[in-house]
Amino acid sequence: INVQNALEAMNEGKKALDEGDYWAALGYYQIVVNDYPNSIFAPEAYYQMSQALVKRGQFMDAFDALQEIVKKYPDYPRFNQIIGAEYDVAATIQSGATPYLWGWFPWFTNYNDAIKIYESVVKDAPYSDYSPIALMNISIIAEQEDKQDVAFDALDRLINNYPKSMFASDAYLQMAKVYRSLVQGPEYDQTPTRNAISFFNDYLILFPNESQVARAEEGLEAMQDTYARSRLVMGDFYYYYRNNG
C-alpha cells in the first residue's frame, strides 16, 4: 500500500470500504493509526476500522478498535457516536450474529462478549442514554445464560442508578421475572417467591399505568398462591411431627 499522507490513506480507505473491500480498507486505516497517531484522522480511522471489522464478523476486534478511541482520544468530539457504535456491536452479538475468526472462519456466538461490551458502555458513559438499556440487555442475556446473579446485579444498578429511565419499570418486572424463574414450588425455600412478590408489588405501586400491569398482576397472583401453599406444607409438616414426635 503506497500513500503519501494520512489524508490520502483515509480517502483510499473510504473508497475500499464503499466497494466492500474490507481487508484493503483495514490496511489503509492501519497506516493512519500506526504512522499518524497524533493526526486529526487517527480516531476516525479507528472508527472506520471498527465498521469494516463488523462487516467481516470480527465483532470483538471491532470493539477493541472503538476502545482505542475511548482510551487514546477521550476528547474526540464524536465520543457519543463511539459509545453508540460499541452498543451496536454488543446488540449484534446479542442478536446471535455469527462471528468469524480472522474474518473468514465461522465461530460460535459468545453472549458473554455482549455482556462485556455492554458493561464497557456503562463504565465509559454512565450518563449516556445507552447505559440504562445496556444494563437491561445484560440482564436479559444473563437470564438466558442461567446467570441469575449477573442479571440481578444489572437490574439493581438500573433501578438504583437510573430511577427516572424509561427502562426502570421494565427493570422491576424483569427482576420479578428472574426471581420467579428460581421458584421451585411450595415445598422448597420461599426466598425467591417472597422476592418475586415484592418486585411485582413494587411494579404495580410505582407504575400503575404501564402496559404490563396485567402481566404483573398475573405474576403476583401466581407467586402469592405458591407462597400460601408453602405455608400449608409447613403447617402439615409441623402438625405431623408434633403429633408423631
Please place each PLM-identified region on the residue numbering:
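Acidic, polar-rich low-complexity tracts and alpha-helical solenoid repeat scaffolds
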Residues: I1-G245
